[in-house]
Amino acid sequence: MALPLAFLFTSPGPVLVEIGPITIRWYGLLIATAVLIGVSLSQYLAKRRQVNPDLLSDLSIWLVIGAIPAARIYYVLFQWSEYAQHPERIIAIWQGGIAIHGAIIGGTLAALIFAKLKRVPFWQLADLVAPSLILGQAIGRWGNFFNSEAFGRPTNLPWKLYIPIERRPPDLASFEYFHPTFLYESIWDLMVFALLITLFFRSLAGKPRLKVGTLFMVYLATYSLGRLWIEGLRTDSLMLGPLRIAQVVSLTGITLGLAGLAWLYVRKRPLPDVVSSPKDTE
């Protein structure tokens, strides 16, 4: 008799392997994998756009330095009542507890500074990074699976996720199975990635001719749309009073993304497209 599908979504635990005093966690491995794949992809896309791929290698360092600390700070700020009592946990990022919206904010600020220093168009960089960013998010979400965190409400759907009792919210301790929101978001992110990559390669042939900034705006709007829905299922949302912070930020992301696209394509002033871009020489 086949095992219920739910057992396919039972975390083996957060630790991949322990070698003496060294502990390698799934979360860290997935983040590292996402970064490596993202850098390689963005370099490849840069070559196709006739942009120096080394520029993207340098940018990736700035993005990591900007995004990861910002993701942690964002999370800690909205969980301050807990971390104020245990300040030693603030730096324990390997235990989980980072917010993708914080990473996007920190990474964007880092990219703006990088673009200013290198004297290259920010929006050109943003377009080249957008597919890598959403693919990295799809990979990184599986860290939530291994940590048994960021899951949804109780459910009996065939694809339900088992959560150990010690990881369940106190008011839901009697429930065993929950929505695998990590899976929902990972699938959504892959769909957004497919859309962005399709637009990128079709634009190489000029069908359609995309203006600089298009891919990033599409990323911002579409990712935020999926997150808006998925966040409503979660049991551990960061809150500000009665509001789910991620949903507020997602609504903002949808608005900014759509407004950005309207600004690019509706206004009368012609803007350069991204069919051919000059090589960076630095």
UniProtKB/Swiss-Prot annotation:
Domain of life of the source: Bacteria
GO molecular function, a single term: phosphatidylglycerol-prolipoprotein diacylglyceryl transferase activity
Pathway membership, UniProt: Protein modification; lipoprotein biosynthesis (diacylglyceryl transfer)
Coiled-coil intervals, chain numbering: none
Location of this chain's protein in the cell: Cell inner membrane
Protein name in the entry: Phosphatidylglycerol--prolipoprotein diacylglyceryl transferase
Family from the record: Belongs to the Lgt family.
UniProt enzyme class: transferase
NCBIfam families listed in its UniProt record: lgt
Keyword entries, A-Z: Cell inner membrane, Cell membrane, Membrane, Transferase, Transmembrane, Transmembrane helix
Natural source organism: Trichormus variabilis (strain ATCC 29413 / PCC 7937)
Reported function: Catalyzes the transfer of the diacylglyceryl group from phosphatidylglycerol to the sulfhydryl group of the N-terminal cysteine of a prolipoprotein, the first step in the formation of mature lipoproteins.
Residues engaged in binding a 1,2-diacyl-sn-glycero-3-phospho-(1'-sn-glycerol): R141
Topology term for the membrane: Multi-pass membrane protein
EC number: 2.5.1.145
TM stretches of this protein: 19-39, 59-79, 90-110, 120-140, 181-201, 212-232, 245-265
One Gene Ontology cellular component annotation held by this UniProt entry: plasma membrane
GO BP: any one term: lipoprotein biosynthetic process
